[in-house]
Amino acid sequence: MACGEVVVEGRSVPRVANPRDTESALNWQLERIGSAAWLDWPLKFQRMAFGYANDSGWHDAADAVSWLDHHKLLREGQAPRGALVWYHAGDRIRVACSLGSGQVVGPLLTGPVEVALLISLSTDYVWSDPHFPFGH
C-alpha cells in the first residue's frame, strides 16, 4: 500500500484533503459554542465541521473507532490541534476535536457545544487525524 492511501474493503482508496482545513473546521465549531442543536450528534457535528454535508458511512462513533482501529489510524498520547479525539463517556464512545493543550470542542455530554478539558471528560481516549474516508 502506498503512503497516503487507505484500504477500504480490499481496495485502495487515495486519501483526499477535507473540504475544510483544520483552522476553518475549528472556527466553524467555535462559532457554535452554546448550541444545543447537536445533542447526541457528535460524529455528525465533526463531519460537518470538516466540510462533509453527507453521511460519514459510520453508524456512530463506536463504529468509526472500530474502522479506524482496524486500519491502524488511531494514536495514543496528547492529541494535536485539529485531531479527532475519541473518548469513553459513560457507556458509549464520543468524539470531539482537539484545540491543543488538552482542550477539546464539540457537543459534549451535557448537550451543548462546549470547550472542555479532555481530562474532565475521560481518561480513556485515543485520537486520529480528521479523516472521513466515506464522507462526501
Where are these regions (language model features)?
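Secreted/periplasmic proteins that engage bacterial cell-wall peptidoglycan
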Residues: 1-90
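Aromatic- and glycine-rich peptidoglycan recognition patches
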Residues: 9-15, 26-34, 98-136
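Generic detector of ordered, mature protein regions
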Residues: 58-67, 92, 97-98, 111, ...
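Structural recognition of the beta-strand scaffold that forms the well-ordered cores
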Residues: 82-87, 95-98, 104-106
